[in-house]
Amino acid sequence: TKSCYLKELGINAIELQPIQQFDSRSPEEYHWGYMPINFFSPSSDYASSPQKAAQEFNSLIDAFHHAGISVIIDVVYNHYGIPNHLLNIDRELYLSTDHLGRLTNFSGCGNDLQCEAEPVKKLVLDSLKYWVENFEVDGFRFDLGELLGFELLSEIEDELKKIYPNIILFAEPWSFRGRLPAKMNQTGFALWSDRSRENLLSIV
């Protein structure tokens, strides 16, 4: 309701950790949803039954919106979980490799997506549009945004603003490969600041 506890705290937006269907082989391997295996479906792990995942996620979004709270979801488009369908479909097309043909590991997960490839760009864009158009998600936080790169992130902003001009976008500006260029500051993206984080930790 509009008098919900979160609203009474002054909260006007919430961010959900990854809720796209993820790899969950055993409780011991739990990783908070950061091993996606389907970019187009809400995780059945959070639903009362697999068949109701989309319906119940829609109800969740509607409830937050009714209370005046925007919903941002954390998305992971830099690597893939197990089973790795993209690896099995076309390893060289979807996954990044080095000069010896080995999978690169700048995500720390062993199978970076090749975000410069047009099919990967289309997959990411189609997925994001799906979440906005079908679930009315208000924004996205991009895990290890550096691996998506400036070009793809800029295209994401352009395409999503055509659908929802007030879309909220922010990203981690780093990966184990490096950092996003300073020109990201001229885009509509907000960026996580590791410097602010470390400064805060130093005084807590």
Regions found by a protein language model. Name each.
Residues G10-N12, A67-I69, D74, E136-D138, ...:
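Short, well-ordered coil/turn segments that N-cap beta-strands
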Residues K2-R25, N134:
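Catalytic domains of carbohydrate-active enzymes, especially glycoside hydrolases
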Residues F22-H66, G81-N134:
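Aromatic- and acidic-residue-enriched carbohydrate-binding clefts of CAZyme catalytic domains
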Residues L113, V137-F142:
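Glycine- and acidic
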Residues L16-S26, V75-N84, L144-G149, E172-F176:
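Short, solvent-exposed turn/loop segments enriched in Gly/Ser/Thr/Pro and often Arg
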Residues Y34, S127, L144-V204:
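Active-site-proximal helices and loops of the catalytic beta/alpha 8
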Residues C4-K7, N58-A67, E157-K162:
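Surface-exposed amphipathic alpha-helices with a cationic face
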Residues L6, L16, F39, F64, ...:
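Conserved, mostly hydrophobic/aromatic
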